[in-house]
Design a protein with these regions (language model features):
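Structured, active/binding-site neighborhoods that engage oxygen-rich ligands
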Residues: 1-457
């Protein structure tokens, strides 16, 4: 079967071995050796050979000694979660509108801040891991610690940054980015379908609004699976979220769902349980296990942030909507304990890198730890926390955006003081059909209307 997607068939297969081990499947040594012996050039497009090995992998089961409980269905997830607030009292309309404006603005600021160094944060440069490379880049320009947008200034150190429209010399709006695109998509879905939307509505909206070349990793695989299994001329009941999330999708516990949490948190402001449910519908067809839980957790945190202004309480609100014995919950609970003894964000990140540095730079768990650490050590100060989230490395624009979104919901735009807000001119220019250019003020108004509709449904 011819199947690619985000990367070559061989690359997908190699990532699949890593993913299977992570989710508790013991890959036989003979299969692992066969894959290791394949040449990255001569075998990368060998569909038949890769298919044959994939068939062997499909028969493997999770080990009985795997210590985690990581259910897939929403019903099972709810049974496995701890107690939590589920829902808070309503907020004054005038305050809520300001908080929506703050959340959209915070998301854009954090995204733009991290965008030029996303590649550096994930892959590192010049022999340095991401966080160290970012620090060296900033120090070489006398910009450490991070306090404003990255400069594209060439000082002869051979570091490379990207996205000139998000650099301090040029920034005038929020440029296209998937972290913003999916928040816009969530808004469009809730506007059109209300609270009863399904995962199929989401897939259809992607097809209608998102160019394939702006979709990455797990999302690339899932939408390809969906379209390959769905006749163009009619709807198909055959394709399932189990198929779209699993078939040739080794990225199913990466960060792609986690960055899609925000819109559901906005639409369900004050209702973490419903926000997590909406996030589940969004994640279940592209991700599995901790990939799903990451989106559910942050949707719940964002929904709670409209009412709660304590970082530990917010983290626990998020944890109350995911299984208590999953890898993400375990990591976050360990992080809360480390926050009691690590004196600052940088020593905290030393621990994160030591214990979770073997994960891919765009995995759900390690990046979630960056965000919650930035919230805690930044003491919910918008400017400082967002800068920490980007300094932490790995997926810098995603983490900056999530952190900024939470803080915007906590404070509202009128209470957010940052030199990084004015340069965006309240404007987003995305690559989403139907949102070619729009102000964050308008997005806040539309989000408020969606919130009222869902609340009253």
């Amino acid at each position: 079967m011819i199947f690619t997607g985000w990367e070559s068939p061989l690359a997908l297969l190699k990532y699949e071995l890593v993913q299977l081990e992570y989710e508790g499947v013991q890959v036989p040594k003979e299969i692992a050796k066969r894959v290791t012996c394949l040449d990255d050039e001569s075998h990368k497009m060998d569909f038949d050979l890769v298919d044959e090995i994939y068939s062997d992998l499909n028969n493997l089961k999770v080990s009985s000694s795997f210590p985690y409980e990581q259910p897939y269905t929403l019903t099972e997830i709810k049974k496995a979660r701890p107690s939590g607030p589920r829902r808070f009292d309503s907020i004054e309309d005038k305050d809520l509108l300001d908080k929506f404006h703050g959340a959209w603005t915070g998301r854009a600021v954090g995204c733009a801040l991290g965008k030029p160094v996303e590649g550096m944060g994930i892959r590192g440069q010049k022999g340095l891991i991401g966080r160290a490379a970012i620090k060296e880049y900033l120090k070489n320009r006398n910009h450490w610690p991070l306090d404003y947008y990255f400069s594209g200034e060439d000082v002869g150190d051979d570091f490379v940054v990207y996205c000139p429209n998000s650099q301090r010399e040029n920034i005038a709006f929020m440029e296209p980015d998937d972290d913003i695109h999916y928040t816009l998509i969530a808004l469009a879905i809730m506007e059109k379908y209300g609270a009863e939307f399904t995962w199929r509505h989401i897939a259809h909206t992607w097809n209608s609004c998102l160019p394939y070349n702006v979709i990455c990793t797990a999302e690339s695989q899932a939408i390809l699976n969906y379209n390959n299994a769905s006749p163009r001329s009619t709807a198909s009941d055959w394709v399932t979220p189990e198929y779209t999330s699993l078939n040739r999708n080794p990225y199913r516990e990466w960060i792609g769902a986690q960055i899609r949490a925000d819109g559901w948190g906005y639409g369900c402001a004050g209702n973490p349980e419903l926000a997590a449910e909406f996030a589940y519908r969004d994640a279940c067809w592209t991700h599995r296990a901790n990939g799903i839980y990451g989106e559910m957790m942050f949707a719940a945190i964002i929904a709670g942030a409209f009412n709660v202004s304590d970082p530990i309480e917010l983290i626990k609100i998020g944890l109350s909507e995911i299984p208590s014995n999953c890898k993400l919950a375990e990591a976050c609970m360990q992080a809360i304990e480390k926050m009691k003894v690590k004196k600052d964000f940088y020593s905290y990140m030393d621990w994160v890198e030591e214990d979770f540095g073997d994960l891919n730079g765009v995995h759900t768990v390690n990046n979630a730890l960056v965000v919650i650490g930035a919230l805690f050590y930044g003491e919910l100060d918008f400017h400082r926390s967002v800068c920490f989230a980007v300094e932490g490395g790995w997926d810098t624009d995603c983490n900056g955006a999530t952190c900024g979104s939470i803080l915007g919901a906590v404070h509202g735009l009128s209470n957010m003081e940052s030199t990084m807000i004015p340069p965006l001119n309240d404007t987003i220019k995305p690559s989403v059909i139907g949102f070619q250019e729009i102000t964050m003020k308008e997005l806040a108004k539309r989000t408020f209307d969606v919130y009222c509709s869902i609340k009253n449904s």
